[in-house]
UniProtKB/Swiss-Prot annotation:
Protein name, per record: Small ribosomal subunit protein bS20
InterPro entries referenced in this protein's UniProt entry, alphabetically: Ribosomal_bS20 (IPR002583), Ribosomal_bS20_sf (IPR036510)
Disulphide bond pairs: none
Family of this protein: Belongs to the bacterial ribosomal protein bS20 family.
Pfam families, alphabetized: Ribosomal_S20p (PF01649)
Length: 92
């Protein structure tokens, strides 16, 4: 355990930041799951709405250093591609 007061404070701050980061990370995952659920049931309108909300939350996570920019871009790209393929399949 930390002996100096500054080290004790740093330990407290680390615990606090860890909880906040876990909460934000969990929220991002939840929004992604909502998009995946809408894609799985084939509802393209709701999937697009859910994607726009999820995209906003993902980019907020990038801004807060929860996830990296390339990871966020990859997730958004893959979800968008799935929604786009949904539209093509439903029009045939």
């Amino acid at each position: 355990m930390a002996n100096h007061s500054s080290a004790k404070k740093a330990a407290r701050q680390t615990v606090k930041r860890t909880l906040i980061n876990k909460k934000r990370s969990s929220a991002i995952k939840t929004f992604i799951k909502k998009v995946v659920h809408e894609i799985s049931i084939g509802n393209k309108e709701n999937a697009n709405i859910a994607l726009s909300v999820a995209q906003s939350k993902i980019m907020q996570g990038v801004k807060k250093n929860i996830i990296k920019l390339n990871t966020a871009s990859r997730k958004i790209s893959r979800l968008s591609r799935q929604i786009k393929s949904l539209k093509v399949n439903n029009t045939l």
